[in-house]
Structures are given as C-alpha cells and as structure tokens.
C-alpha cells in the first residue's frame, strides 16, 4: 500500500513515512481513492480540420467529464486540408473559442490554450527580422599594396543585416575552388549537364536510382595540378537524424541513435588522379540526415591536402534496399583548396547533430588562419557595403559577415495565421509572439470570466539557429572573450589551431543553448507568471533540431513536459528527461504528452501498459495527444485529424466504458 500511495501521490514529491501520522495517511488514502480533478489526465483538443459547431463542443466536453478526463487544451493543429474550418481570429472563431471556454467551466474541466496557431511559436506578425537567425558571409580575395574601394559581395541572397567585416592574409593558392579555377566538368548521366551540380542555385539536380555497384561519375579536369583540402555539397536528406531525446535504449557507445534512425551508407567517394584513368580515394561523401523540419542540407568533408589534375565524385550504392526514395538530389558542389573544420555546419550550430570526435586533419600553421593577423575593417564599410581600405602587402581575404532569417516556419496551424517561427534567442521576438496570440486569447477570455488555466507549448521542429541581434554581447558576458575574431570559424575556417577552433565552437554552442533557455523559455515563463497562468512546455522537444540543453531548458519552465508515443514499442521516449529536470530543478509536475498517434486498433489495455512505463519513468501528469474535435453528432468515426486517428474521443466505441482507464491514471 505504501509504495502505491507514494507513486500515486507524486513522483516528484515522495511520501515521507517518518513524518506521517494517521491523519495524513487517511488524507492520502482519501486523495488516492477520490482523485482531485487536478490529478486527472488532460487532452490536447485539436481544432481546425473541420467546421465548428456549438453542439459538437458541448458533446465533446460533456463526454470528457463523464469519462473522467480532467481538462482540455484548445489547440489549432491541422494535418488535413481544413477546407471548412473557420479562419483563425475571425469573428466566428472568437465566438466558438469563448463558447468552448465557457462550456469547459460549466462542466468542470480545466481549460488551457496553446502558445501558437499550430506549433510551435510563430505567425504572420513575425517578420524576417524577428524570425530565427543564422550567420552568413561572403568572401573576396585581393592582392595587397593597393587602395581598395568597392562594394563587397552581399553575404545573403535576400534580406540580411551586417555584423562585421574582417580581413586576414592567406596565400591565394590556398583559397581556390572549382568556381575560381573553372575546370572542365563532365558526367556520365544522360540528359544532365554536369555544370548543374556545381552552379550556385537553390534547386538541386536529381540523380535517378542506379543498379547496385553502378556508379555515376562527375568529373573535374583542372588541366593543371590542383590541391584540395575540403569538399562542400548540398544533398537531399535521408532517413532520420540520430539526434533526438528519444534515443533507442542501448549500451553506451560513440554514437547514439534516435527513434526511426537508420544508418545510411556514404553517397560515394571523392577520388583523385594524375592521368584521368587510375583514381584513388580521397574521402567518403557523407549523407545528411533529416532533423525535425530542418531545411539545412549542406555538408563539408575535410581531408589532408591532396594534389592532382583530375578529381571525380564516384556516386554509387547510396541507399539501402527497400528505400522509399532511392534517387539522390545533389548540387552546389565546391571542391576547395581551403582548410576547413570537418562537418563545421554541425559544430557551428547551422544544423543540430550529435557532436562526435573532430575528424579535421592536423593542418600545418601555413594552412590555417593566424588569429593575430585578423584585421577588423567593420568601421571602414559604409551602409551600402562599400569598403575603402589601404591594403597591406600580400594576398588578403575579406569576409563580410551578416545574419539572415533561417526561414523556419510554424507548422500545422490554420492557414491564415501560419508564418515564420520567432527568434528563440530574442526577448523582443518571443514577447511579440506572446502579445499577438496567447495574450489576446487570455485577455479576451478573461473579459468574460473564463480566463484560461494555462498555456502549453509543443516541441520545436523548425530547424536550428546560431545568431540573434546582440549575440556578441551575450557571448562576451557569458564566456568572457570577444567572438568577432572567431567569426571565420563559424563559417568553417580554422582560426589559431584545430583545437582552439573546436574549443570556440563548443563555447558557441553552449552560449546558443544558454540564451535559448533564458531568453525563450525563461521569457515565456515570466510572461505566464505575469498573466497568472500555468506554463507547460516541451523545452525544447524530442527532435533536438536546434542547439539546446533540454534539461536546462526544461528547468526554466513551471511544468517540464516530455512525450511518449503509442507506436514506439522499443521505448524510445524522452519522458525521463522531463522527470529528471523536475528532480534537478525542484518542479512539482513532470508532464508527458501521452499516447501520441494512438490508433483505433489499439485497446485501452495496450495503452495502460504504456502508461505504466511512463509512470515508472516518474512523470506524474498526462496530456493526451490528441483528441480530435468532433463537430457532428451523427458521423462516425468523425474527424480523424487528417488521417492520424486521434482516437481518444467520444466517437470511439469503448469511450463510454473507459472511466476506469482514466481513473487509474488519476491515481
């Protein structure tokens, strides 16, 4: 009995027999026998797939109450076309929201709202300047002993904001690429221009599936010796990123793999030849995995300097048997004499992956940038990008750094209020999101005496960011040194040494994670406190598609939340992360998005087994993902969330018999 009471009372507030008396034991037993509504499971109630009716709202909420559900979260999440759904924030939408909140209060259910239309924090009020940001740069190599006066190349294709201009001496023969040297390029792919693989454009070139062992060759003939140290390319992503808080259980290893991750073979190899006949391998061309909603598709592979007239990409056997998408899309290939950090895009936070052993070669001092030689030319560039500089002797590279929007969008909301995701490191951007969505709903419902009980936040799935306005001050304050001289390292160049550069990139990622925890989740918690509502957040979520410290981020919110799905039978859930954060940071509630994507074919007995697993991981609040809003009284199964079932609703044949299932969870 004692162990059951301990588990039921609170996973994060253990029962204390040393201070208990008969009164407290009786009180605990009474609470266990007749759980308070606050202990009951809640549901995410997805709207936006269908029309909205008052009778449907009432029927849903009364059915929840009958079954023993404790509360609902109003959440506009759309996976189908939503053809008959009301536009968000329309007069009719507001009327239905107010009616739903009023009905929830009438029947005795808690009523919470989602932070955003869809997920996770964005909308049309988020301009490019307030959206997620990343560093970008252009470079120009010039001869010394001259008065340089010219407009530097734009560092971004669209809107961007300048940060700094730096210059450093580099021998010209160590800054060459196939773009500067213009080799003859050919390929053995009928109907495809080899030039398409190398030109800078947004669309990649599709390579059709090949028979096992058959190669597609993309050839470069420099007509003279060329020394290469790195290759950069964009390629279609495959499988699912190994990054994930939802790791497949296993023994400690150098690599950890997330749910649905399948290790992919290389795309092929880069090869070199002196005669164009006999080739030797330079390096494997590594694949890129699909991180949650990340648009980033560029990778750089570094290798010791290799010289030859002929180079080729030998592409073969890049997919596994049974792959649903056996073709490959490739483009923006750059073979370069520049020494780069291997896979710098991940280490600099453009793309979130586990940071494994640094495989960058041990380049010589002559091949890397000497920190002491970097010159700050920021003050010499005008607002129009024109730089005037008396260039010292030698070959010099000028880099113009700026930040730009990543373009990361909000997902699965009503069409008229979708937009860019807010900057996760900007208090201004986060507050703008709050003021334009959650605050409006809280104020409107408060005016009719049905103020929401809380605000919830889903997992982040909009890719990574590594910059925000004022980031340099955040870095200086937190790390104690100026990052400006290391900006080239954020674009993959080696500054000082490989070890020094890697140490800086660690500090960079650590700072990004810290600022996201403080300025994103910390700000939202402050805003919820001021509004007098609870805050539950999947900070930052199981997909880990941006650089973050999930335990730290969860510690910034009132109720840290993980999730467990109904289909991941191997137990790869991130709920233990939520309960760990609750223990570390002294939170009373460790919440869980529960039974995600449960199907009509799954019984309550199956779901109970999952519940027991989650309780053993010490979470003590369930919020079902999801229960699709049902507008009709005479259609079955009714709305299925765009085909995802969302079956825990009044149209399920076992609903009226499910009270023991919900009572069990409350205890």
Task: For the regions a language model picked out, list residue spans one by one.
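Active-site-adjacent "subsite" loops/lids of carbohydrate-active enzymes
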Residues: 123-202, 290-296, 353-442, 472-512, ...
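N-terminal carbohydrate-binding accessory modules
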Residues: 15-39, 47, 55
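Solvent-exposed serine/threonine-rich low-complexity stretches and specific carbohydrate-binding patches
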Residues: 282-290
């Amino acid at each position: 009995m004692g162990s059951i009471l301990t588990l039921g009372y609170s996973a994060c507030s253990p029962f204390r027999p040393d201070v208990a008396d008969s009164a407290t034991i009786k009180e605990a037993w009474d609470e266990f026998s007749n759980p308070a509504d606050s202990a009951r499971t809640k549901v995410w109630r997805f709207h936006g797939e269908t029309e909205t009716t008052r009778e449907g709202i009432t029927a849903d909420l009364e059915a929840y109450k009958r079954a023993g559900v404790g509360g609902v979260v109003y959440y506009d999440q759309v996976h189908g076309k939503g053809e008959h759904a009301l536009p968000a924030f329309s007069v009719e939408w507001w009327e239905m929201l107010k009616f739903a909140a009023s009905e929830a209060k009438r029947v005795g259910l808690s009523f919470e709202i989602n932070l955003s239309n869809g997920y996770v924090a964005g909308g049309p009020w988020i301009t490019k300047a307030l959206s997620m940001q990343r560093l970008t740069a252009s470079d120009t190599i010039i001869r010394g002993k001259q008065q340089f006066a010219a407009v530097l190349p734009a560092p971004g294709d669209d809107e961007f904001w300048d940060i700094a201009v730096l210059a450093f001496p580099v021998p010209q023969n160590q800054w060459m690429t196939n773009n500067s040297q213009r080799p003859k390029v050919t390929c053995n792919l009928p109907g495809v221009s080899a030039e398409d693989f190398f030109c800078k454009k947004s669309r990649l070139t599709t390579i059709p599936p090949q028979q096992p062992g058959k190669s597609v060759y993309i050839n470069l003939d420099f007509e003279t010796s060329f020394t290469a140290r790195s290759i950069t390319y964009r390629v279609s992503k495959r499988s699912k990123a190994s990054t994930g808080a939802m790791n497949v259980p296993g023994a400690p290893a150098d690599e950890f793999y997330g749910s649905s991750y399948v290790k992919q073979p290389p795309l092929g190899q880069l090869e070199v030849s002196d005669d164009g006949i006999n080739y030797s391998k330079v390096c494997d061309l590594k694949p890129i995995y699909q991180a949650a909603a990340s648009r980033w598709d560029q990778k750089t592979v570094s290798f010791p300097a290799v010289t030859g007239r002929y180079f080729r990409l030998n592409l073969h056997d890049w997919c596994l048997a049974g792959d649903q998408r056996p073709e490959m899309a490739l483009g923006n290939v750059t073979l370069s004499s520049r020494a780069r950090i291997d896979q710098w895009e991940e280490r600099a936070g453009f793309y979130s992956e586990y940071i494994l052993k640094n495989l960058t070669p041990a380049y010589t001092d002559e091949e890397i940038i000497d920190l002491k030689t970097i010159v700050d030319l920021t003050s010499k560039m005008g607002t129009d990008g024109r730089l005037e500089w008396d260039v010292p002797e030698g070959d010099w590279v000028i880099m113009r750094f700026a930040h730009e929007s990543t373009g990361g969008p909000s997902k699965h909301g009503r069409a008229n209020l979708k937009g860019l995701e807010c900057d996760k490191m900007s208090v201004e951007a986060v507050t703008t999101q709050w003021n334009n969505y959650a605050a409006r709903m809280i104020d409107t419902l408060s005016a009719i005496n049905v103020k929401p009980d809380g605000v919830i936040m889903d997992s982040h799935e909009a890719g990574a960011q590594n910059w925000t306005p004022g980031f340099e001050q955040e870095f200086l304050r937190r790390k104690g040194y100026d990052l400006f001289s290391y900006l080239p390292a954020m674009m993959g160049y080696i500054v000082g040494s490989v070890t020094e550069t890697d140490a800086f990139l660690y500090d960079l990622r650590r700072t990004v994670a810290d600022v996201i925890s403080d300025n994103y989740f910390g700000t939202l918690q402050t805003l919820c406190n001021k509004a007098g509502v609870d805050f539950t957040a999947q900070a930052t979520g199981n997909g880990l598609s941006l650089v973050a410290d999930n335990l730290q981020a969860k510690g910034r919110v009132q109720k840290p939340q993980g999730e467990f799905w109904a289909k991941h039978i191997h137990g790869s859930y991130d709920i233990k992360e939520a309960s760990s954060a609750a223990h570390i940071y002294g939170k009373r509630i460790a919440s869980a998005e529960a039974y995600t994507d449960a199907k009509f074919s799954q019984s309550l007995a199956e779901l109970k087994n999952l519940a027991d697993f989650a309780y053993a991981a010490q979470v003590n609040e369930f919020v079902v993902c999801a229960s699709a809003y049902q507008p009709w009284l005479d259609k079955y199964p009714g709305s299925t969330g765009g085909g995802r079932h969302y079956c825990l609703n009044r149209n399920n044949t076992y609903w009226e018999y499910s009270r023991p299932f919900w009572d069990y969870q409350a205890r």
